[in-house]
């Protein structure tokens, strides 16, 4: 035999049946891993094609069985087991379809490669039919039977069975030497792997330490990043505050300038208001004197009205007496003309007195109205005086407040605010005194009253026709006597 072609070389799961003793037919069965190797070779003498089946175990070095199958032996095998494929197709069929994934295991830890990962003639067709391998050992371990079964959900059937003989002598020694060399290679590989593992463990420890350090550095970096973000936010806030402060300082400077102008104008207004207040006070005192005089005149008129009423009662009584007298003297023919003349005089006198009473009543009503108007004007003057007093007090408080703020120290951090106060809107007043005022030309003229609806000043003293007539009548009565009561000045 010259050359070999390995068609299949994989570790399979098989059921190993071993007799308990030489004399007992019972078997001990257990699952084990066996390595099946199928190779194709040529006979050196005849050149005939042959298939070599070889099984071994990694945990039992003496477990080595093999059998060479040529065309003649295969025909006997096919006839015994009713095989339908020829000798050339036999290895391909059993490799690709019978040795499926259910029994083929990938044992990369043993240095093998799964047949399903190989391409070509000896690759495994996936999925394949479920199969089972049984290996029956001889009691003396001189041969074994390699049986291949197909499985169904309810039964299993034998496909074929090959009798393998134990390998001994030089072939076994060669097999053991191969195992030793492979084990030596594995051992050296293990040593290298152990050294590499130790170095890797050391590196892993170093890496773990570095990872711990890096985790700490990462946490510090995250903390620093958060602090940096916070600082950036604070910087932005500081920038915004600085800009706001700058704008505020500019506004405050403008407000301070306006406040200076307002303070000066308020000072001037305060002085003018004080002068106006003095004038209004004098005016109120004058008006109060006039009211007192009117009240005195009203009392005198009331007394005169009482006298007139008494005279009216006397006249009525005289009229009644005259009526009685007329009734008494109605029968006297000679006295009729005289009585009629007296009666006419009495009636004329009564009409004159009635007209006088009516005129006095009208005069009293007019005087009462004028008195009420004067009272209202006096009340308005008092209200105006109180308002002016309150405005004067408010202006004094504002000026004191402005002076206090003006001479108080400015807040720290705002140097632009040390020159003045905050701007505030102040109510505007119409000037009363001065060259461009209604009373600027003549300060001795009548002081105006302040209107309730507007801030302009108007003279509220208006002479009515009745008051003018009454005053002229009073002046005439003082010199010539009363024309109404026909009494001299001394008797009034």
Swiss-Prot record:
Its main location: cytoplasm. Gene3D superfamilies: 6.10.140.2140, Spindle assembly abnormal protein 6, N-terminal domain. Keywords: Cell cycle, Coiled coil, Cytoplasm, Cytoskeleton, Developmental protein. Residues 192-407 form a coiled coil. One of its GO terms (cellular component) is centrosome. Residues 46-98 form the PISA domain. InterPro entries: Sas-6_helical, SAS-6_N, SAS-6_N_sf. The coiled coil domain is necessary and sufficient for interaction with sas-5. The 35 nM long coiled-coil domain mediates homodimerization while the globular N-terminus links the dimers at an angle of 40 degrees to form the inner ring. Nine homodimers form a cartwheel structure with an internal diameter of 23 nM and radial spokes connecting to the microtubule triplets. Interacts with sas-5. This is Spindle assembly abnormal protein 6.
């Amino acid at each position: 035999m010259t050359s070999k072609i390995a068609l299949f070389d994989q570790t399979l799961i098989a059921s190993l049946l071993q007799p308990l003793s030489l004399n007992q037919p019972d078997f001990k069965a257990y699952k084990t891993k066996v390595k099946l190797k199928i190779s194709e070779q040529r006979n050196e003498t005849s050149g005939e094609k042959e298939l070599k089946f070889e099984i071994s175990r990694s945990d039992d070095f003496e477990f080595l069985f093999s059998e060479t199958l040529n065309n003649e032996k295969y025909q006997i095998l096919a006839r015994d087991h009713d095989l339908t494929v020829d000798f050339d197709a036999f290895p391909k069929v059993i490799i690709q379809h019978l040795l499926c994934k259910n029994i083929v295991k990938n044992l990369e830890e043993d240095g093998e490669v799964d047949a399903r990962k190989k391409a070509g003639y000896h690759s495994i067709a996936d999925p394949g039919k479920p199969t089972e391998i049984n290996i029956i050992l001889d009691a003396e371990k001189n041969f074994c039977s390699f049986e291949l079964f197909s499985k169904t959900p309810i039964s299993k059937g034998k496909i074929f069975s090959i009798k393998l003989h134990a390998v001994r002598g030089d072939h076994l020694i060669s097999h053991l030497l191969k195992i030793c060399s492979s084990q030596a290679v594995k051992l050296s590989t293990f040593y290298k792997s152990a050294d590499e593992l130790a170095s890797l463990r050391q590196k892993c420890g170093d890496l773990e330490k570095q990872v711990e350090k890096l985790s700490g550095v990462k946490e510090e970096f995250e903390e620093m990043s958060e602090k940096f973000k916070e600082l950036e936010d604070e910087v932005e806030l500081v920038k915004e505050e600085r800009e706001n402060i700058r704008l505020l300082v500019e506004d405050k400077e403008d407000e301070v300038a306006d406040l200076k102008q307002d303070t000066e104008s308020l000072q001037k207004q305060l002085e003018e208001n004080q002068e106006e207040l003095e004038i209004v006070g004098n005016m109120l005192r004058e008006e109060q004197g006039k009211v007192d005089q009117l009240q005195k005149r009203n009392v005198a008129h009331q007394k005169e009205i009482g006298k007139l009423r008494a005279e009216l009662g006397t006249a009525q009584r005289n009229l009644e007496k005259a009526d009685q007298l007329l009734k008494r003297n109605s029968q006297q023919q000679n006295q009729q003309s005289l009585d009629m003349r007296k009666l006419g005089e009495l009636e004329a006198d009564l009409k004159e007195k009635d007209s006088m009473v009516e005129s006095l009543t009208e005069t009293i009503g007019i005087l009462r109205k004028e008195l009420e108007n004067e009272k209202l004007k006096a009340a308005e003057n008092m209200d105006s005086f109180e308002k002016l007093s309150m405005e004067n007090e408010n202006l004094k408080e504002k000026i004191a407040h402005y002076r206090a703020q003006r001479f108080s120290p400015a807040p720290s951090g705002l140097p632009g605010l040390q020159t003045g106060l905050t701007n505030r809107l102040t109510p505007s007043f119409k000037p009363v005194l001065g060259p461009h005022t209604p009373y600027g030309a003549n300060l001795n003229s009548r002081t105006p009253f302040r209107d309730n609806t507007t801030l302009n000043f108007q003279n509220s003293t208006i002479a009515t026709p009745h008051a003018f007539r009454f005053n002229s009548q009073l002046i005439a009565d003082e010199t010539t006597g009363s024309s109404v009561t026909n009494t001299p000045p001394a008797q009034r």
